[in-house]
Amino acid sequence: MSKLVKLFITSISAITLALVSFTSSFAKVEGDYIVLGSAISLTGKYSSNGVHTQNGYNLAVERINKMGGVNVGGKSYKFEIIYYDDESNPKRAAQLAERLIKQDGVHYMLGPYSSGLTKAIAPVTEKYKIPMVEANGASRSLFTKGYKYLFAVLSPANQYLEVAIDLAVEKNGGKPVRIAQAFEQDAFSQDVRLGILDAAKRTGSKIIIDDKLPKELNDMAATLA
């Protein structure tokens, strides 16, 4: 099983644990099904990863349902998911989260793809006290706002490459290393960058290149020269 699929199954499993913690009256139930909601990127710039995300959610739900679903309040339920295409647009994602909660009546959400879209939806789920488990939003700022209804199954972006710096220092006999980095200026990429800066300071390593890349980049020759 691929790492990506395992991540999505972990996401659904986290929702399952949350469900077991509540009574069945809290969730939207249609017959023997508990209905989850997800605004996901099926079109637009995130569509490729959005479709992968949807496929992962569907695979996890299929496996859980085949195993008999989950037990809530002494009764077994299976999952189904209502999807809407957020078009890779934060404003649209927030609107669809409102629709899923207010019109479709879902009481549990699965997160979108990307930190930006997760940031757009999180205030909505927080407003309505709807738990959202997400596996694709890693920006550090998501976890510094005191959200009580946002649950992530991955580490924050600032931790992504810290271990790489630690490993490089270890392989260098414990001595500081020279680091070259180049990142786009979006929130996620800059969070990864800040993690490297922290690791460099901690290990006494030196940043020799710290380039900020434009949004549309076709040539990195200047950085690599």
Protein language model regions, located:
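Short, low-complexity disordered leader/linker segments with a strong preference
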Residues: 1-35
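Acidic/histidine-rich, surface-exposed loop or edge segments in extracytoplasmic proteins
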Residues: 37-45
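Beta-alpha junction/loop-to-helix N-cap segments that form part of ligand/metal-binding clefts
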Residues: 28-29, 35, 48-55, 67-144, ...
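Residue-level signal for short, function-critical loop segments
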Residues: 42, 87, 183-186
